[in-house]
């Protein structure tokens, strides 16, 4: 038995939640114990640009990108659990980071 931590990131929270739901369903089918999904704070990156190319610095525009993240801990992962996670087809815009938490 090993402990696995999955960290998922995406710009769109709806796509992220669908991916998390499919992971949770696949892990529960194998009989592993799961903790989460734990929502992490949304990271907001703001960019300020000047609207005109040369003058009018007082005229600016702001853009932001929001990065949503979730953490899932699989407490008692079996080889069957790892196999089902490998076969899972997730959305391409979701970034998945897998870590083994064994000491």
Swiss-Prot record:
Name of protein: Small ribosomal subunit protein uS10
GO cellular component, one term: ribonucleoprotein complex
Similarity annotation: Belongs to the universal ribosomal protein uS10 family.
Assembly, per entry: Part of the 30S ribosomal subunit.
A Pfam family recorded for this sequence: Ribosomal_S10
Keywords, comma-separated and alphabetical: Ribonucleoprotein, Ribosomal protein
A biological process term (GO) from this entry: translation
Purpose of the protein: Involved in the binding of tRNA to the ribosomes.
GO MF annotation list: structural constituent of ribosome; tRNA binding
High-level lineage: Bacteria, Pseudomonadati, Campylobacterota, Epsilonproteobacteria, Campylobacterales
Top-rank taxon: Bacteria
InterPro entries found in the cross-reference section: Ribosomal_uS10, Ribosomal_uS10_CS, Ribosomal_uS10_dom, Ribosomal_uS10_dom_sf
């Amino acid at each position: 038995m090993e402990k696995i931590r999955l960290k998922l990131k995406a710009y769109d929270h709806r796509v992220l939640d669908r991916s998390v739901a499919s992971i949770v369903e696949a892990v529960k089918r194998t009989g592993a114990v799961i903790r989460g999904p734990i929502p992490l704070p949304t990271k907001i990156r703001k960019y300020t640009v000047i609207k005109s190319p040369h003058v009018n610095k007082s005229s600016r525009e702001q853009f932001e990108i929001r990065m949503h993240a979730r953490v899932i801990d699989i407490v008692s992962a079996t080889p069957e659990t790892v196999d089902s996670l490998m076969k899972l087809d997730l959305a391409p815009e979701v970034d998945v980071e897998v870590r083994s938490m064994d000491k």
